């Protein structure tokens, strides 16, 4: 009688955790392999793929129609003086407003600047 993969998986699914551990140990002994090495390689690759960006930069791409409102929004968000905020806004496109901030902070800053009429990117 030939057993297919699906039948084996069904049988393993009904086993307790301890039974599965014993099965793995028996398979390692019988075939002379180690499941730990394969698991470590698979887990290492998965960890790299799962890494998520945690720090974001907010970049002013365009000022829009209401330059004064954008300067006020930049001033409020960055704590810069009027002249520094004006110079920063006028350096758009690609004026980095804040670097290395959380996603929530970046989204909030983007929203406030877009409400003022600016075009903003989060990188």
Curated annotation (Swiss-Prot):
Keyword rRNA-binding: no
Entry keyword set: Ribonucleoprotein, Ribosomal protein
Family: Belongs to the bacterial ribosomal protein bL12 family.
Function: Forms part of the ribosomal stalk which helps the ribosome interact with GTP-bound translation factors. Is thus essential for accurate translation.
Subunit details: Homodimer. Part of the ribosomal stalk of the 50S ribosomal subunit. Forms a multimeric L10(L12)X complex, where L10 forms an elongated spine to which 2 to 4 L12 dimers bind in a sequential fashion. Binds GTP-bound translation factors.
HAMAP family reported for this sequence: Ribosomal_bL12 (MF_00368)
Signal sequence bounds: none
UniProt-listed SUPFAM superfamilies: ClpS-like, Ribosomal protein L7/12, oligomerisation (N-terminal) domain
This protein's GO CC annotations: cytosolic large ribosomal subunit
InterPro entries per record: Ribosomal_bL12, Ribosomal_bL12_C, Ribosomal_bL12_C/ClpS-like, Ribosomal_bL12_oligo, Ribosomal_bL12_oligo_N_sf
GO MF: mRNA binding; structural constituent of ribosome
UniProt-recorded name of the protein: Large ribosomal subunit protein bL12
GO biological process, one term: translation
């Amino acid at each position: 009688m030939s057993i297919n993969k699906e039948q084996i998986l069904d049988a393993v699914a009904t086993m307790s955790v301890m039974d599965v551990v014993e099965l793995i140990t028996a398979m390692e002994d019988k075939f002379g392999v180690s499941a730990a090495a394969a698991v470590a390689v698979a887990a290492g690759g998965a960890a790299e793929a799962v890494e998520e960006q945690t720090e974001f930069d907010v970049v002013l791409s365009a000022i829009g129609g209401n330059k004064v409102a954008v300067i006020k929004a930049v001033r409020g968000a960055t704590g810069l003086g009027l002249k520094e905020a004006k110079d920063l806004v006028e350096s758009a496109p690609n004026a980095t407003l804040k670097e290395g901030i959380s996603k929530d902070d970046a989204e909030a800053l983007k929203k406030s600047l877009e409400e003022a009429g600016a075009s903003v990117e989060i990188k």
